[in-house]
């Protein structure tokens, strides 16, 4: 997510994996056979921030590495603007940050859309963007006049850490009443008849090779899906729900936003080590009018979604089941340095467990919208520290949306949950689909 940039950059600069700077060659783009001919598949690689892939913007085209973000609202590019002026030396500093040069593009134009600013984000205070238009290409599928966000921070760029991407490819759903400032690039391309309405996604983390990801670690299909990776009969569709309370429960941006890929979380169980099943930890909470409100599950494929999601009560129950040991400060530092857990999972304890007993640990079971269960095996929520023989519980205890009695209003469905599933985001029906990956 975009609001996590600053915090993540401070922790990760200098320790990014090699894949962060190496994307498969653009020849890896390919069209996908399916119901819609207007689709293109792109490989993506993982780093400490999330999945990265390449697009081009402008005329002549400038190749930019994008951070995939299902929770952000638009296509954002780092620019040579700040303090309401164009001055790359002032606004980018000397870090070597890659960026989009609007003045090198003959097709770039400013818009009359208002400048927007978010006073409070984890990236930086007063995160400010202008809106322009330009040609955007995903592979060889291009869409002219795409509305995009252009950075215009109210301070020089020297103090902003360098990140290994030039912008954010937001893919949040466009719900009723949202204007062009909330329109992702692929949504605009669909509306213009350049792409289909769907985006397909899969990780190769649980697959035998990277071939289904075109040599990357994940694959995005803009305008369609890769039907060879799932059985359509097993695809379960969930219409999104974006109530007003979601903004504060998920991430309290100012001004608030509620347009996310969500569905009711109606069940959260832990199958105990002695075949004992826990109680249901997806507990309704009291709404503003006193009625019971069902928690929501939020899709988040980025760094903030790392780890299996649990409430505090569920986490404590799991720790008892696996006889977890409170991690030392040194181990916690190793966990953060490795980048295998969400960096906004603050205010939670970390626990180490025996690496030899993983197969005997319980499964985590999640029920979405009252009718489909999904299982996360222990191999996907127990993580080994790369430089030691230590294993730890990789649990996402999201710091927002917690209730005083240890329950949670939201659960982030990230890589631990999604790695064995095919994901379909549908901008036309405002729904998403999940199906088991064909292994």
UniProtKB/Swiss-Prot annotation:
One of its GO terms (cellular component) is extracellular region. Disulfide bonds join 355-391. Its main location: secreted. It is an enzyme of class 3 (hydrolase). This is Secreted aspartic protease LUC8. Transmembrane segments: none annotated. Residues 51-435 form the Peptidase A1 domain. The keyword Protease applies. The active site is at 69, 300. One of its GO terms (biological process) is proteolysis. Residues 1-20 form the signal peptide. Secreted aspartic protease; part of the gene cluster that mediates the biosynthesis of the mycotoxin lucilactaene and the lucilactaene-related compound NG-391 that act as cell cycle inhibitors with potent growth inhibitory activity against malarial parasites, moderate growth inhibitory activity against cancer cells, and no activity against bacteria and fungi. Within the cluster, LUC7 and LUC8 encode proteins which are not commonly involved in the biosynthesis of secondary metabolites and are not essential for lucilactaene biosynthesis. InterPro entries: Aspartic_peptidase_A1, Pepsin-like_dom, PEPTIDASE_A1, Peptidase_aspartic_dom_sf. Glycans are attached at residues 33, 54, 110, 126, 179, 289, 329, 373. The gene is LUC8. Belongs to the peptidase A1 family. Its EC number is 3.4.23.-. One of its GO terms (molecular function) is aspartic-type endopeptidase activity. It is found in: Secreted. Keywords: Aspartyl protease, Disulfide bond, Glycoprotein, Hydrolase, Protease, Secreted, Signal. It holds the Pfam family Asp.
């Amino acid at each position: 997510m975009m609001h996590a940039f600053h915090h993540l950059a401070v922790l990760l600069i200098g320790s990014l994996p090699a894949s962060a700077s190496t994307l498969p060659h653009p020849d890896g783009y390919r069209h996908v056979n399916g119901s819609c001919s207007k689709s293109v598949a792109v490989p993506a690689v993982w780093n400490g921030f999330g999945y990265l892939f390449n697009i081009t913007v402008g005329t002549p085209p400038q190749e930019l590495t994008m951070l995939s973000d299902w929770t952000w609202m638009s296509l954002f590019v780092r620019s040579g603007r700040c303090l309401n002026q164009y001055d790359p030396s002032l606004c980018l500093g000397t870090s070597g940050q890659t960026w989009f040069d609007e003045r090198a593009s003959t097709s770039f134009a400013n818009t009359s859309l208002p400048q927007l600013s978010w006073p409070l984000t984890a990236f930086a205070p007063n995160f400010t963007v202008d809106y322009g238009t330009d040609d955007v290409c995903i592979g060889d599928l291009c869409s002219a006049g795409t509305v995009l966000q252009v950075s215009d921070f109210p301070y020089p760029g020297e103090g902003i850490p360098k990140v290994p991407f030039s912008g954010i490819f937001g893919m949040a759903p466009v719900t009723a009443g949202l204007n062009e400032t909330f329109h992702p690039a692929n949504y605009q391309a669909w509306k213009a008849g350049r792409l289909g309405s769907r985006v397909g996604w899969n990780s190769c983390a649980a697959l035998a090779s990277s071939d289904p990801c075109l040599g990357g670690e994940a694959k995005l299909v803009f305008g369609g899906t890769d039907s060879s990776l799932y059985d359509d009969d097993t695809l379960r569709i969930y219409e999104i729900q974006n109530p007003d309370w979601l903004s504060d429960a998920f991430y309290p941006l100012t001004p608030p936003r509620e347009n996310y890929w969500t569905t009711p979380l109606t069940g959260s169980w832990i199958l105990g080590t002695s075949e004992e099943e826990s109680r249901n930890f997806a507990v309704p909470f009291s709404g503003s009018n006193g009625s019971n409100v069902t928690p929501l599950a939020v899709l988040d494929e980025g760094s903030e979604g790392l780890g299996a999601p649990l409430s505090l009560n569920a986490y404590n129950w799991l720790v008892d089941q696996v006889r977890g040991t409170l991690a030392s400060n040194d181990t916690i530092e190793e966990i953060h340095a490795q980048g295998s857990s969400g960096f906004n999972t603050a205010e939670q304890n970390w626990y180490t467990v025996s690496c030899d007993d993983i197969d005997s640990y319980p499964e985590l079971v999640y029920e979405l919208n009252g009718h489909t269960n999904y299982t996360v095996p222990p191999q996907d929520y127990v993580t080994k520290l790369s430089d030691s023989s230590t294993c730890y519980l990789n649990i996402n205890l999201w710091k927002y949306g917690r209730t005083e009695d240890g329950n949670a209003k939201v659960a982030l469905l990230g890589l631990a949950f999604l790695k064995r599933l095919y994901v379909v985001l549908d901008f036309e029906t405002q729904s998403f689909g999940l199906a088991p990956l064909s292994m």
